[in-house]
C-alpha cells in the first residue's frame, strides 16, 4: 500500500514538473521570441545540415515550415528584434525581394558563363532546403541584422551622415560576408561580395532583415537549379 502511495505521489510530482516546464517553454516562445527564435533557428539549421536520409529530411522539412511560420509571426514583436531589423518590410518589398533574388541569381549565372566558370551541380535535397530556408535566415540575421546594426550605430555615433553610414555598412558587411565563406577565391569571392552588397541594399531599402533573407533564399534556390545550364 505504501509503495502504491509513493508511486502516486511520484507521478503527481512528475506531472507538476512537466506542467511547469511546459509553461516555461510556452512563456519563452510567446513572450521572449528574441531568445527562442535564434535557438530554434540554429536547431533547424543543424538538423537540416545532416538530413541525408528520407526520414530525417521529412523532419527537417516539418521543422523548417514551423520555423518560417514562427519567424513570420514574431516580426517586430520585441525591441531586440526591431534592432535586428526582423520586421515586416515596407509596402511592396516582399515582392521586390523575390524579384531581386531572381535577378541576382540570373546575374551571377551570366557572369559565371561569361568567364566559363562552373557553378557546380545541383546539390542534394537537404542542401537545397538548407540553402533556401534556415541558412539564409541565419546568415541574414547575423550579417544584415546584428552586424549591420552594430556597424551602422558605430558610424552614426562618429557623426557620419546617414547615407554614408548606410553605404559603408553595406560594403563592409558584404566583404565580411564574402570572406566568411571559406574557400572562395577569384570570381567566386567577387560575386559573393556583389550579392552581399545586393542583400545589404535590400536590407536598407526595405528596412527589414526579413526581406533580405527572402531575397537571399530565392537567390540560393534558383541558383541551385540553374547552375548546370
PLM feature spans:
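N-terminal, membrane-interfacial amphipathic/helix-forming hydrophobic leader that caps
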Residues: 1-92, 103-109, 224-229
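Phenylalanine-focused residue identity feature
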Residues: 12, 21, 36, 40-43, ...
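Generic signature of intrinsically disordered, low-complexity segments enriched in small/polar residues
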Residues: 15, 24, 39, 43, ...
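Alpha-helical transmembrane spans of integral membrane proteins, capturing the lipid-embedded, hydrophobic core
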Residues: 32-35, 39, 43, 61, ...
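Membrane-interface helix caps and helix-loop-helix hairpins in membrane proteins
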Residues: 49-55, 117-118, 179-187
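Juxtamembrane helix-loop-helix connectors linking adjacent transmembrane helices
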Residues: 51-54, 75-142, 149-160
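Short secondary-structure boundary micro-motifs
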Residues: 54-57, 66-70, 117-120, 160-161, ...
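Transmembrane helix-loop-helix hairpins at the membrane interface
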Residues: 125-229
